[in-house]
């Protein structure tokens, strides 16, 4: 009897050991895949970079501010000659460097009476950081950027709105959990959660196999980013009364609409606080038409911000 119990105990220990080894292997694989996809620096291609001198009447002032681990982020306040009516904080996408890719949009907003605070997130262009670290870092950096604009004393006390694309589209919605005072948000080609975006990318590479490591991804992000990782765009919407405009093109292969637009529309499609605009054939940069930047759409953006700011001014 004792020999039988001893054999069962040894077998149980072996099985436990195997389970631990499998978990450790999955954990190591998860971290490696995660870092390969997200934990790297991104620099703008100098051949395509725009400069403030390329735009008539555009001015900017450089600032540095600290993010969560003390890393210094570089941001610029862009204005035209007229006094701004409000401040738009812009969050850029991931993979192409910092905010420089959005200079045309920045200039449009500035020329139409808004100050634009645009910065390079951790691990991008002029900001510090060996790598981005992960998608929740975008929410963290935006949280610190909005607080810097509000609290540093460097900027006029004006209503604040947000604009984000892709990674930035996720960030500007999720950050509402921390900044419900924001008046209006425009999110282009964004996604609801970091985990969802990892799933979308992982399915392209590993198919259904991605679902075996998603629990480890969730744990890894929670350990690394805390509550920032668990808060979604939908959480931000529920914590804020901000007006929200959501844009997406249904042929977007980088961020499929099912991971953002569709989720939002199911809950808020009939909510007057939300406005949904979809396209069929604009790909990931849905603010561009076949000729380039869609200025009619940007005029719509400006009108959206103006309406929300004036509503708050009027009480």
Language-model segments: which ranges?
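An N-terminal hydrophobic leader/cap segment in hydrolases
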Residues: 11-66, 76
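The serine-hydrolase catalytic nucleophile loop
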Residues: 94-108, 121
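Hydrolase active-site cap/lid region
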Residues: 174-226
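C-terminal catalytic histidine-bearing segment of alpha/beta-hydrolase fold enzymes
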Residues: 269-315
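Conserved alpha/beta-hydrolase
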Residues: 108-128
